[in-house]
Amino acid sequence: VKVPEPEKLAQIKAAGIDHVEVVFNYFWRNAPENECYTRAYRVKALLEEAGLKVWSCHLPFSRQLDISVPDPALREQNVALMERMIRLASIFGPQRLVLHPSSEPIADEEREIRLQNSANSIGRLALSAKEIGAVLCIENLPRTCLGRDSGELMRLIADYPEVMVCFDSNHLLKEEHAHFFEAVGNRIGTIHASDYDRKDERHWLPGEGVIDWPDFLRRLQASGYKGVFMHEVRAGVNA
C-alpha cells in the first residue's frame, strides 16, 4: 500500500493480516525532513485505528541516501539521517528495522572500500536500533548493490552478532536460495517474500515466478525463523 488510507488498511485487516511493515520512504521522499514526523504520527494513528501491528520499519533509501559512499562528509550526513529515522521509528514499536547496505551503481574498483564503509555504518546504526529495542536487519540486494550474495552480506554483519538479515526472496540473482539459507543460517531476522524470474527483481506474488515455495518454506522453518511472513509485492505487476 503506497498511501495508507483508512479504507485500504481496513481491507488489509479484513483479509486476516495482523502485522505490517512501515516503509519510511513514504515519510521521507519528496518532503522536507521536518514533515516526516507529522506524517509518521498520522500513519501510527491510522494503523492503531485499523488494529494493525507494526512488525518492522523499513528505513529510507534512495540513490543518494547511501551509508557506503566514499565521501566521508556525505556518509556522515546519511548515517546521521538514519539515526534520526531510527528514533522516529520508535513510535511504532517495531521488532525489526530493515536497512539497505548501499544503493547503486557500484563500480568494481570501489566495491572493497564501500563494503568497509557500509560495515562501519551498520555497527553505528545497530547501537541506535538497540536503543529503541529493535533488531537491525540488513537486506540482501540485487545487481551491483552491496549484499548481493550471502558472502557479502555475512561479511557486512560479521562483527555484530546482534545484527541480522532481511532475506528478500526476489533479490537473489547470483545465488540459489538453498545456498543462501545454508550460509546465513539462523541470522535471518525478517523476510520480504515475493516471486521473480531470476533475471531481475520483480516483486510478484508468490507462485507467479520461479521460486520453489514449498522448499523455501521448509528451509525457512529449518533456519529457526519465528518471525512474520512479510510479503513485499507490487500491486498489478505480473510481467
Residue ranges: model-predicted function:
Residues K2-D18, E48, E83, G123, ...:
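Histidine-acidic metal/acid-base catalytic patches
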Residues F24-Y26, P60-R63, P101-P105, N140-T144, ...:
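Active-site-proximal loop/turn and secondary-structure-junction residues that shape catalytic pockets
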Residues P32, C36-R39, D71-N78, E110-R114, ...:
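Residue-level preference for long, well-ordered alpha-helices that form the structural scaffold
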Residues V1-K2, L97-S102, H192:
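Short, conserved structural micro-motifs that define repeat-unit consensus positions
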